[in-house]
Amino acid sequence: MSINIDGISIPDTALTREITEIVRDTASPLLFHHSSRVYYFAALAGQKRGLTYDAELLYCGCMFHDMGLTHQHSSACERFEVDGANAAKTFLASHRINQQDIDTVWASIALHTTPGIPQHMHPLIALVTAGVEMDVLGLTYPEYSDEQRQAIVNAHPRGNRFKEEIIQAFYEGIKHKPQTTFGNVKADVIADKDPQFAPLNFCSVIRNSQWDS
């Protein structure tokens, strides 16, 4: 469902229609609606910040950002962010999108759970993270009007238990490869769900390396 919020909408193109269809068919309704909301929050953030970006590519980055959590795109040993980025890369390459744009979308997905870095990079990279941080963490909640938030949620519902359901979805998507959470926020997800989880400690890795000193 495409809506127009203060001039922001999903571009009606063959590329975006295919993206919508692929994500709807591959991801759960929870992830599909989450990713759709991420696009609107990201695009509105871009509007407020006066950033220039390609709306089709932003839509791709937002919609594919959690595809690494799906069975179809989840690898055995890569971070889920990389899996999603690789899925987007394969899709865009099949449509002969230029390599620079593919690389930008790849980075926007790969870095979307890395706080403090994306906002200093290409607008598309910054905005995918901005959308995710708004929908999952609510970090910029006051920056959107009640009307904007409600319109987005009406079109793409959060449901009554989104907070717990998204944490569970994260866990289900990464529990088979907990080693990929070293040094990133998803270690908190594993720890929340698995009391036996013993995350790698950065200082311990240093001290236990094969170096003599």
Model-identified regions with their sequence ranges:
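His-Asp-centered metal-binding catalytic motifs of divalent-metal-dependent phosphohydrolases/nucleases
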Residues: 55-74, 84, 106-115
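Alpha-helix boundary/capping segments in eukaryotic regulatory proteins
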Residues: 28, 48-56, 72-80, 99
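N-terminal glycine-rich anion-binding loops that anchor highly charged ligand groups
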Residues: 11, 33-34, 53-57
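Short alpha-helical hairpin
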Residues: 2-20
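Active-site flanking loop/helix segments enriched in acidic
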Residues: 15-34, 67-72
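Internal catalytic or translocation cores that form aromatic/hydrophobic pockets or channels
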Residues: 89, 93-108, 118-122
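An active-site-proximal "capping" alpha-helix that borders the catalytic cofactor pocket
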Residues: 38, 79-94
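Divalent metal-dependent phosphate-bond-processing catalytic cores, especially two-metal-ion Mg2+/Mn2+ enzymes
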Residues: 2-6, 26-32, 36-51, 97, ...
